[in-house]
């Protein structure tokens, strides 16, 4: 067997850094996530160029099976430098990669036929979910078939528990599989007509519950009409039965207000406008043949029937703008149309490659050492997926860089002019993707259940007919290769490599600030900050890559170090002004999604980002507007509504008495300066941990055991925490007089890391305790890593304490340990910080503040130890 060359991480990183023009984040993401590796971590690709040749050669191999094949060079030219066509993560990693037995599909939906709410059926779905996740797939499934709480059952429980406990089961399975590099992503959905839908909507409001799943409610037009008209609504089970066993009359408006409140408070549930999805769905023209849509993938952009799957690919819209950011910028529509047809063709080739991967998976299952009774469920699962994939040959051609394309054309995201332009682009994409699918039907054959008669009244097909009559006639004559073709996904890390905005979204921030450690004796650096241990740091501005291009095109010095005021002025002059994720016109963004949705046969994944201080009424308006505009789904995120997510830093502290954004301002969209601090004033995050950190030593009792916590400090702020037993043969022997020291990160020759603690004794001699992490119970160590992660990214300490307190842990010992960690961290809370959400146990008022690590009531003076 041929021995392939391997590369060290540094070799691959340096080569990729040059490939991406010095973009460290893009290079690091590519090496970590997409470079071909084996199970031992050996790296077989030095740069994305080698990856693109790997993909091009495999696609060309498939092309040679059919008429008019593309060459490997032609495919490579489409992929090179992520310029035109970008396969999504699973295809990019898996195509031509024989070191992993994994699927090329990004998304799956599962669900059993018939009466599927028995324990056996629920366990089978749980198993199938895990089996798909371990092969890289994101999974969605619907819970509408589960009997509502209190329904009679023929087992020892006598009545059904309802669907919420099973949400937690499926969520925990996802969290379990999403470890050690495996992927876990889950969507759970339920119909608003289900009697337990309110419990489903509330399930994630309790901290620590259903944390491994996204949840969305399938909303019907009937329900929305009842909301608008403030009428009652009847829920029932089964939801589609003419003779339901359970009925329940509710106030539609009250339940809707709960959806709105929960979305405002925690960003979930998302809403799926289910009647719109089904009405527009081409696969549902074949519902009786097994293509009835039941749920979506985790991000919501691909509604699917059970056991169908989809692979994703994006066109980089920015690359089709000629002379970007100039007065004569124009979009190369002819090149785009040609590439849209080729993108659809490449997607069809990837289906053939996926069939090969599924065969490999099934072959591996057969040869696994387990007994057939264990293996048969997974084998049968992949049989069902292969059959459905062959029947429909579903694809997910989409786009990225919409926000940058709009800016490069001199338009402002969120205006009617920009929306009209985007609609033209997506109409062209739809017509040419479908044209390509018809051409492939002539050359390769139509998907096996194609029937023009079934589709003739479908609204999407009728729009194609109106826009291009010849395409429609050819489709009736020759058929179509793919049952559905289009989507718009959140392109995530792939947009880091295209160095553009993600998917259909606007730019998140055009400018932000980072800090790096420097040698103060180096004449080429400027020291902006010196920490308490004497380390020097230089602050530097990071520009969104296309904002930098705008500066260059307009003759603005990109090397100059600008003041905050100068940066503000630059942003105001640019096409990105009032067009970022947080200050775009929200209602126009929703309307834009609805307009574009008319030319996307699957769905669109979009998040509407809102400032922290908006009220629930705005969320209500956005959701109702999304329904009326023809969106298939909608998700909102209010800044700061989820702990652990970095929030915008306000110019002034927001108080409970501050008025929400009024309606007129919400319509007109105030500038970022009115609602949030400018983009450059986020907390500073040090990208690379310094080798040494100052450390506080905090001791506490865990049951009857003596424990010690080592709190690493950066700029006086907790950065990491280590915990372990004291005075034990396997623990940490430490004099009681030691209260401070240093945590030193050591790197071994093999690249692995360990953390040592060093302190000075009373005589001034240094003592080093090696390998802190090796001295801890792995369960405690994993929780300590979680806590260190949020500390590192500067979540406020009082929020970290709240997060630690919300951890749902298994036994008394680890819960006592958790309480000790909370006490250790409370000493770092700034005196006077309000303990939001906590009431004084004496007077019952919400007037507790932190003072010297204790909670003090400002109303009655009571105090208690943290």
Segments and roles (model prediction):
Residues 2-73, 155-169, 179-291, 322-326, ...:
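Conserved, charged catalytic cores of large soluble enzymes
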Residues 24, 294, 300-302, 354, ...:
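Catalytic alpha/beta core of large soluble enzyme barrels
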Residues 36, 58-65, 78-155, 163-166, ...:
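Function-dense linear segments that define catalytic or interfacial modules
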Residues 76, 237-238, 339-386, 390, ...:
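Internal maturation/activation junctions in enzymes
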Residues 472-474, 650-711:
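Short, Gly/Pro- and small/polar-rich lid/capping loops
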Residues 840-843, 857:
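Short cysteine-rich clusters marking metal-coordination/redox-active sites
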Residues 846-848, 863-864:
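Cys/His-rich microdomains that often coordinate metals
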Residues 853-863:
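Cysteine-rich micro-motifs
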């Amino acid at each position: 067997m041929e021995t392939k060359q391997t590369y060290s991480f540094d070799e691959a990183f340096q080569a990729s850094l040059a490939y991406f023009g010095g973009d460290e984040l893009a290079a690091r993401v590519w090496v970590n996530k997409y470079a071909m590796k084996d199970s031992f971590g050996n790296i077989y690709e030095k740069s994305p160029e080698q990856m693109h040749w790997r993909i091009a050669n495999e696609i060309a191999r498939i092309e040679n099976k059919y008429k008019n094949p593309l060459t490997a060079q032609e495919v490579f030219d489409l992929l090179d430098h992520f310029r035109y066509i970008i396969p999504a993560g699973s295809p990019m990693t898996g195509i031509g990669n024989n070191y992993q037995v994994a699927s090329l599909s990004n998304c799956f939906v599962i669900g059993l036929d018939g009466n599927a709410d028995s324990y056996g059926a629920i366990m089978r779905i749980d198993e199938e979910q895990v089996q798909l996740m371990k092969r890289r797939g994101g999974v969605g499934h619907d819970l509408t078939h589960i009997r509502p709480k209190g329904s009679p059952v023929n087992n020892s429980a006598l009545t059904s528990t309802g669907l919420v406990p099973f949400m937690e089961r499926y969520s925990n399975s996802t969290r379990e599989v999403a470890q050690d590099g495996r992927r876990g992503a889950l969507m759970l959905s339920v119909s608003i007509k289900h009697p337990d839908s309110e419990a489903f909507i509330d399930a994630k409001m309790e901290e620590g519950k259903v944390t491994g799943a996204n949840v969305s409610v399938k909303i019907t037009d009937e329900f929305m009409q009842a909301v608008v008209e403030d009428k009652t609504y009847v829920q029932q089970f089964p939801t589609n039965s003419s003779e339901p066993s359970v009925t329940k009359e509710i106030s539609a408006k009250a339940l809707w207000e709960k959806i709105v409140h929960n979305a405002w408070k925690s960003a979930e549930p998302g809403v799926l406008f289910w009647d719109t999805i089904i009405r527009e769905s081409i696969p549902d023209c074949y519902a009786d043949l097994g293509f009835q849509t039941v749920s979506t993938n985790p991000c919501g952009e691909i509604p699917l029937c059970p056991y169908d799957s989809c692979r994703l690919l994006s066109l980089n819209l920015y690359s089709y703008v000629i002379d970007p950011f100039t007065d004569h910028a124009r979009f190369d529509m002819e090149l785009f149309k040609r590439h849209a047809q080729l993108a659809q063709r490449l997607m069809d080739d990837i289906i053939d490659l996926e069939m090969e991967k599924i065969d490999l998976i099934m072959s591996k299952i057969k040869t696994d050492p387990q007994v057939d009774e264990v293996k048969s469920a997974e084998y049968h699962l992949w049989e069902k997926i292969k059959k459905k994939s062959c029947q429909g040959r579903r694809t997910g051609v989409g786009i990225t860089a919409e926000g940058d394309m709009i800016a490069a054309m001199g338009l402002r995201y969120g205006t009617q002019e920009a929306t009209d332009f985007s609609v033209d682009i997506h109409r062209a994409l739809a017509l040419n993707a479908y044209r390509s699918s018809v051409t492939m039907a002539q050359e390769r054959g139509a998907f096996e259940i194609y029937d023009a008669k079934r589709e003739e009244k479908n609204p999407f097909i009728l729009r194609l007919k109106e826009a291009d009559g010849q395409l429609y006639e050819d489709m009736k004559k020759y058929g179509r290769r793919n049952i559905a073709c289009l989507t718009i996904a959140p392109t995530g890390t792939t947009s880091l490599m295209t160095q553009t905005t993600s998917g259909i979204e606007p730019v998140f921030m055009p400018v932000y600030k980072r800090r790096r450690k420097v040698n103060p004796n180096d004449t080429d650096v400027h020291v902006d900050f010196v920490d308490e241990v004497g380390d020097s740091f230089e602050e530097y501005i990071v520009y969104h890559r296309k904002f930098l291009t705008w500066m260059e095109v307009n003759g603005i010095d990109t090397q100059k170090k600008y003041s905050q005021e100068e940066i503000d002025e630059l942003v105001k002059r640019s096409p990105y002004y009032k067009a970022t994720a947080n200050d775009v016109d929200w209602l126009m963004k929703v309307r834009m999604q609805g307009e574009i949705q008319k030319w996307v046969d699957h769905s669109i994944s979009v998040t509407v980002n809102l400032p922290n201080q908006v009220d629930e009424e705005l969320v209500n308006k956005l959701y109702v507007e999304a329904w009326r505009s023809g969106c298939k789904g909608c998700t909102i995120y209010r800044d700061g509504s989820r702990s652990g997510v970095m929030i915008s830093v306000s110019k002034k502290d927001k108080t409970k008495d501050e008025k929400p954004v009024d309606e007129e301002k919400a319509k007109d969209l105030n500038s970022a300066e009115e609602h949030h601090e400018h983009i450059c004033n986020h907390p500073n995050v040090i990208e690379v941990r310094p080798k040494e950190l100052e450390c506080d030593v905090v001791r506490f009792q865990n049951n009857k055991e003596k424990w010690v916590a080592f709190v690493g400090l950066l700029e006086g702020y907790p950065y990491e925490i280590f915990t372990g037993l004291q005075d034990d043969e396997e623990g940490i022997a430490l004099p009681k007089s030691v209260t401070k020291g240093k945590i030193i990160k050591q790197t071994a020759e093999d690249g692995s890391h360990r953390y040592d603690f060093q302190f000075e004794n009373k005589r001034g001699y240094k003592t080093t305790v090696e390998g802190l992490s090796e001295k801890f119970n792995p369960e405690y160590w994993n929780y300590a890593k979680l806590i260190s992660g949020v500390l590192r990214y500067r979540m406020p300490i009082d929020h970290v304490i709240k997060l630690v307190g919300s951890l749902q842990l298994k036994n008394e010992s680890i819960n006592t340990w958790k309480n000790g960690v909370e006490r250790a961290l409370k000493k770092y809370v700034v005196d006077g910080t309000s303990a939001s959400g906590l009431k004084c146990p004496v007077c019952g008022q919400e007037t507790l503040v932190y003072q010297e690590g204790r909670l003090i009531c400002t109303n009655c003076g009571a105090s208690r130890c943290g």
